[in-house]
Each structure stands twice: as C-alpha cells, then as structure tokens.
Design a protein with these regions (language model features):
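A compositional/biophysical signature of low hydrophobicity enriched in polar/charged and small residues
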Residues: 1-180
Length: 180
C-alpha cells in the first residue's frame, strides 16, 4: 500500500490503493470481541468488570481482550461525546470541494491546510462529481465566512459549494459490528 503522508495521525492513500485488504486483526475478531466493541461503543466509561459481566467474561480476560483490541488498532481511542449546540457550535456545513490539480504535492498541501483547521470534523476524498467533502462545525455565519476565506486561500480550488444542515435527523458514533 502506498501512503502519501500521515497528517495529524491520519493516512491518505494514493488513488491506486482503493482495494485495501482486510487487516489481519479484523479476521481474528470472535463473537466476544465483537460484543466488547458493541458495549464500549455504547459506553466507554464502564469498568472492565461491568464490560466483562455484559459479555460473559471475568475481568482479567476481558481486560486482556480490550488491550489486544487497542494494540491491534481496532479500538483507536476512548472519548467523551460533546453536544455541539451546548458549546455554541450550532451550524453544521457540508463543504464540497473541486480541484483542477490532482497532484500528490497539491493534495499534501491541501490535506495539511484542512487538517490544521479545527472547524473541520471530517475530511474525505470522494468519487463522483466532487473531489473532497468536509463536515464543518461553526458558531455562526460570520465564523463560517472566516473559515471559508481560510479554506479558499490555502490552495488553488476549482469550486467550493457549502450546504448548511437545517436539522440533524440521525447521528450515531457506534459502528455496526458485522457478525463473524
């Protein structure tokens, strides 16, 4: 697999690397590992004993499995989910970006710029009619305008389209854990 360059712990893959094989650790997940992942995604603040009770293990084997899932990179980190509205970030914007330049050097510069912008919550390279999609959160239109001006001055862009979310209908953080 050819990696362009890590940016803030994220890896950007070259376009020829779309077929990424399953990581070996994914093949080793058994039913108990999957239960642990489901429980942790619901509430990562549970004690190891509580998690063990829910999945049918005592504390030590449960803790060893959690450590292995972390070491294998299946569990990336444990975080607190914060209500964006309660901290004054009431506007969500989906920003579509089109570029005339598709070189690796341009992508590195663009990825560095976007990754340094704290308003950007998610950043994707897309297939289809746009090249990149960003999910951005800001306090108000004035804050978005400041963000927009930073974005368009970072690198040459062909087109930027902003779509403002009117209402959040569904938002989950727990991944659907596939059966073994």
């Amino acid at each position: 697999m050819r990696v362009l360059r890590p940016v803030n712990g994220t890896k950007f893959f070259a376009m020829t690397d779309l077929a990424i094989p399953l990581h070996e650790s994914n093949r080793r997940l058994d039913a108990i590992d999957r239960k642990i992942l489901t429980v942790l995604q619901e509430d990562a603040s549970l004690s190891v004993a509580e998690i063990g009770d829910r999945v049918g293990l005592s504390s030590t084997p449960c803790w060893k499995r959690i450590q292995r899932l972390e070491a294998d990179g299946v569990i990336l980190r444990r975080v607190a989910l914060v209500d964006q509205n309660k901290i004054g970030l009431g506007i969500t914007v989906f920003v579509s970006v089109e570029s005339a330049d598709h070189s690796e050097a341009w992508l590195r510069k663009f990825a560095d710029a976007v990754s340094s912008m704290p308003e950007v919550m998610e950043f994707y390279r897309m297939a289809g009619d746009v090249d990149y999609m960003l999910r951005v959160v800001v306090a108000d239109m004035q804050s978005y305008d400041v963000f927009y001006k930073k974005l368009i001055s970072a690198v040459p862009l062909k087109n930027v389209t902003s779509r403002f979310a009117m209402e959040k209908i569904k938002s989950v953080t727990a991944l659907p854990i596939p059966a073994a």
